[in-house]
Structure formats: C-alpha cells, structure tokens
C-alpha cells in the first residue's frame, strides 16, 4: 500500500485549491494498483502534507498524521485499506519479540518532556502488525542513548540497530536473528580522523547474498559538501560479527554521498547511489566506477530494495542486480503496477 496525494490548484482563486489524500493497494497476485479508502481529509495546498503510511505486512498498514501545530491522529487497517480504525500513538506496554511484519522506531524513555522537543534518552519501540500500536522492546541492544534501528528486517530475517558502544564510545552495530530476543554487537573500524569529526548521523546496513555492508553517514571534512555525505563503507563476510573498512571517503573521488542504502549484489558487487549518480564496485567496495542510471533513493521494503527515482517511477530488486520497474501516480496512468 502507498499514500498518494493529488492537488488541484486555482491560480485566480488560490483559496479554491485542495489536495486529496488517497491510498492505493497492490493485492497479492494482482497486476495493477487499485484505489482504497482513506481516513485522511482533503487539505489546502498551503498546509503541506503531514501524513505518512507505514506498511505492517500483507494488507496491514498504519497512517499517522499531524504534529507541530496540527493534532496527532493515527489509523490502522488489517484488510488492505478497505476499512480503518483509530489507534493511539503513545507507546503502551512491552513486547519480548519483534513479530513478522513489524516496523521498528524510537521514542523517548519516560518521563518524556512536554512538549517533546528532544529526548534525553531514546528507546526502541515495535509497531505491531496486529493492532498498529507501539510497544517498547523488552531486550534491546546496548548501544547508548540514541539507538537507531532499521525500520524493517533484512531478507535473511535479521534486524539491525546502530549506535555507540557503551564501553569504548565508538560507532557500533547490532543484529538479531531471533526476533529481538538476543543481540550480537560489533564495533566498526574507526577512521584515522574519527576523533576530529562530529558524531555520525547514521549507519545504514544492507544484507546481500554473500556480504553485509554498513555505510557511515555523517559530516565530511574537505571536498565538496553534500546533503547525504558518506564517510565510509564497511563490509562483513561473517554476517556482521566482524567488519573491514573497504572505502574511506576523501576530498576527491566518488562516491562521496549515499542516498539511502547500499545495494549489495553477488560476488563482491555493491552499488552506492550518490546525489549525482550511482557508482558500482565489483571488488567488495574497495573501488568504484560510474554506473548507468540517474539519481535515486534506496530503501528496504517487504518486497526487496525499492528505488525511488523520478516523480512517478520506481523499481525493486531482491538480488541487487535485476530490477523490476513500475509506475505509480503517473499523469498518463494513475495508478498502475507491474
């Protein structure tokens, strides 16, 4: 399921403009997207879109709207968007396991400040595919006050979280292959200049057919600045227990940025989509050359890695090599699938 926003404007009378917020669903085995009901109201174009849709497994999704000056509201569906019911957004209770279809996030460790501006400490929460409610994970990995979980599981069923090693204070990642009941943590190899750089913004992990890749995202020193700077790329051949730093970004050379996740393929192949172009490696990330294709944002979904390119063009891959393209909300075909 996806959330689509279509706006109608009137240049002569801007107050007549409106944006319709709709849901489209691609049912299992179907060849095309179909419109479904949405609990969201029409909004004026000047307000901007504040809603987001989170898929929680087949036929299940959560819509969250509001924040800032707008009231917070949430709705959950378990029947593919045919009906929606209101759910609360606050974290309620604890869960010992991350169920299939769940999505991970964070919230403030109680007591949280009111209004919430910045948490002193954050915790990992599980958005349940059963009811769309948030519950704190009972046994999270020990990765400091700002754990950063990947939203969804990797293809092998593993869940990943990045943060700070509590002993050394260095950047680290942890994975679980038993639904969050236990975690294995490892420290990432530090750059020689790590002490002179600000803290990382994030570590983005992608599991491939024969290796795991972890991209460090954070401010660079020297060279042309970017909005999504990649400091380094690490590779693991033992499922994330140990790491080798294969790429360190310098003042020149590409890739210097990464839009979303690295795309791992077989036999040492990995692609990094930068802000200007994609770059491919066939030696496990030690060297890169320009690849075909335009700029894209890469993220993990339940159907593989999703490439979001131009306004209405998308593609998915399960092996990092073959991509299945489709259009969604294109002007000449609204909506379509393939």
Predicted regions and their residues:
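Extracellular glycan-interacting surfaces
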Residues: 1-338
């Amino acid at each position: 399921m996806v959330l689509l926003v279509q706006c109608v404007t009137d240049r002569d009378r801007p107050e007549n403009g409106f944006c319709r917020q709709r849901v489209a669903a691609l049912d299992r085995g179907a060849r095309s997207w179909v419109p479904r009901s949405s609990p969201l109201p029409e909004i004026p174009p000047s307000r901007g879109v504040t809603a987001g849709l989170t898929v929680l497994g087949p036929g299940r999704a959560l819509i969250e709207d509001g924040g800032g000056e707008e009231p917070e509201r949430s709705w959950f569906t378990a029947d593919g968007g045919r009906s929606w019911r209101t759910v609360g957004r606050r974290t309620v209770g604890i869960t010992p396991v991350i169920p299939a279809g769940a999505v991970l996030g964070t919230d403030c460790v109680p007591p949280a400040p009111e209004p919430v501006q910045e948490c002193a400490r954050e915790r990992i929460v599980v958005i349940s595919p059963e009811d769309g409610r948030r519950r704190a994970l009972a046994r999270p990995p020990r990765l400091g006050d700002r754990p950063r979980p990947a939203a969804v599981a990797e293809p092998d069923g593993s869940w990943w979280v990045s943060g700070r090693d509590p002993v050394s204070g260095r950047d680290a990642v942890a994975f679980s292959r038993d639904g969050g009941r236990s975690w294995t943590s490892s420290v990432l190899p530090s750059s020689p200049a790590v002490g002179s750089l600000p803290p990382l913004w994030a570590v983005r992990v992608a599991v491939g057919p024969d290796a795991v890749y972890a991209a460090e995202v954070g401010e660079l020193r020297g060279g042309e600045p970017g909005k999504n700077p990649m400091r380094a790329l690490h590779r693991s051949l033992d499922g994330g227990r140990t790491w080798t730093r294969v790429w360190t970004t310098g003042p020149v050379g590409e890739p210097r940025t990464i839009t979303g996740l690295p795309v791992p393929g077989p036999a040492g192949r990995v692609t990094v989509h930068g802000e200007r172009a994609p770059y491919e490696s066939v030696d496990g990330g030690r060297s890169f050359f320009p690849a075909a294709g335009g700029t894209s944002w890469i993220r993990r979904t339940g159907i593989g890695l999703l490439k979001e390119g131009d306004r209405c063009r998308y593609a998915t891959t399960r092996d990092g090599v073959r991509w299945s393209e489709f259009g969604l909300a294109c002007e000449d075909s609204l909506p379509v699938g393939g």
